[in-house]
Amino acid sequence: MDNHKVLILLPESLEIQEHIAFISTIFQKQYDETESIARDVQWKTKYYETTLDLYIDTYDVLQEWVNDFVSDECKELRDVISGIIFVFKDEDHKPPVECLKNLIDERIEDFTAKFFIGCYFNENVIEEDELYELNSDLLVQNFEIVNWFDKPDPSMDKVGSERIKEIIDVHPWLSHPETLKKNQGQINISPIDLDSFMTKLEQAKERYQTFDDSKEAELFIEKIIDELSDMIV
């Protein structure tokens, strides 16, 4: 059975040690910088565990990388990946975000079944209000921007690496059954009802866009995450 495939895109402007630290922090794996594919990476939550292959690539000029990625030669990769984690550090964060948004809209088939994370690797973080507005606009694409250097706050939702892990945790790995952990044993569970899941997700997106109050929107998202998690497990 094939492993799930996740593409990680890193800017060449990051130091090698930052590449290693990023991947090791998210995936709890000792990453060898000479690897372009890290196979058989275990992802475990309270409810399930699965196995990932990490496809690791770098870019100098993002648009040039995108031009290659949308070519016919890369169609198979575009089709099989379960998600993309895109790291960027540009002081003007809007052009790279727009570039990836257009990629998702125009060239990723069935993007609602995949996850897309933009990790802003810059200590001058995107301000909370702007980040909220940005992610509201990207919700339809299953694309979320996360500040890597956001400071955790007990009163806030998860941020930084913990938020990235949370997004991966609740992703519905739809291509094959997962392993559910129960007590000391393990049992197999069937794939979720994809139609019901996607209908609920689309309804949630439409409702989310009607909120004007950020706190109400955050509470709604927490509720939906719990409900979708229940559907997965």
Swiss-Prot record:
The keyword Disulfide bond does not apply. GO terms for molecular function: protein-macromolecule adaptor activity. Keywords: Chromosomal rearrangement. Signal peptide: none annotated. It comes from the Eukaryota. The keyword NADP does not apply. Pfam families: Adaptin_binding (PF10199). Coiled coil: none annotated. One of its GO terms (biological process) is vesicle-mediated transport. InterPro entries: Irc6. Belongs to the IRC6 family. Involved in gross chromosomal rearrangements (GCRs) and telomere healing. This is Increased recombination centers protein 6. It comes from Kluyveromyces lactis (strain ATCC 8585 / CBS 2359 / DSM 70799 / NBRC 1267 / NRRL Y-1140 / WM37). The gene is IRC6.
